[in-house]
Design a protein with these regions (language model features):
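Acidic/histidine-rich catalytic neighborhood of metal-dependent amide-processing enzymes
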Residues: 1-66
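Metal-dependent amide/peptide-bond hydrolase catalytic core
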Residues: 53-58, 65, 71-246
Length: 246
């Protein structure tokens, strides 16, 4: 920034650097709060460049031009506890949650788009708190995460999931609870002179023409895209979330 300002004495704008230590997990006390503050102040931001580790193997390989949305759901099925020798006197939530997870996993959300991978659901937890081998449990729970492209919103995904849950639980005469957490909606930054300029600068410095991509997880661009067009470019991310991350 200092070099740029020294070389461009007539520059009449402002350049701000935002450094946050709250980017993972719920990420409520970092970029999100700054974005809310800037909205209240009615600050106009022309462009944001997020320093996310976007490159798979070499610096210059990839620029992120958008991100998939992320929705996590925790399902709880309430059946009826009973003895395994008398299943007609119980209602096994384990069996019901297996039916639900099987149907959820087999949803064909879409085939992907020009810029996005197909929407994907992964089951991340299955919990049945039961220490007895001969007892049908009362409750079974599971957690899943969906990474969705811009053909969907978190709202449309929830509707689809809720319809399946209602159908299967009605059939099995069981009750269910579901809690959702949305980490971000899918977004795509339109290509313009600024995005082309950044791509050309990366090529000039690294001698590699970067691929434009929307792969990977969520980043703080999910907040910044609400106030400004943004791209992501940074270091190589081969060791992200691993021991000795570098």
């Amino acid at each position: 920034v200092s070099i740029f300002l020294n070389n461009n004495k007539s520059f009449n704008g402002s350049i701000s650097l935002l450094i946050t230590g709250d980017e993972e997990g719920d990420a409520i006390n970092g970029t999100k709060k700054v974005v809310d503050y800037l909205k209240k102040k009615k600050e106009k931001i022309n462009f944001c460049l997020v320093g996310e580790p976007t490159n798979p193997n070499k610096l210059g390989e990839m620029i992120k031009i958008g991100r998939r949305g992320s929705l996590t759901g925790k399902i709880e099925i309430i059946g009826m506890q009973g003895h395994v020798a008398y299943p007609h006197r119980a209602n096994n939530p384990s069996t019901i949650i297996i039916q639900i997870l099987n149907e959820l996993k087999n949803i064909k959300f879409d085939k992907g788009t020009k810029n996005f991978q197909p929407t994907n659901l992964e089951i991340t937890k299955i919990n049945i708190d039961n220490n007895a081998d001969n007892v049908i449990p009362r409750v079974a729970s599971a957690t899943f995460n969906i990474r969705f492209n811009n053909k969907h919103s978190s709202g449309s995904i929830k509707k689809k999931i809720n319809k399946i849950l209602s159908k299967i639980n009605k059939k099995n005469k069981s009750k269910f609870k579901i809690d959702y957490r949305v980490s971000g909606e899918a977004f795509l930054t339109k290509q313009n002179t600024t995005t082309n300029m950044i791509r050309n600068v990366v090529k000039k410095i690294t001698k590699i023409r970067p691929k434009l991509s929307t792969t990977g997880g969520t980043s703080d661009a999910r907040f910044l895209k609400n106030i400004s067009p943004c791209l992501e470019f940074g270091l190589v991310g081969k060791t992200m979330h691993k021991i000795d991350e570098a």
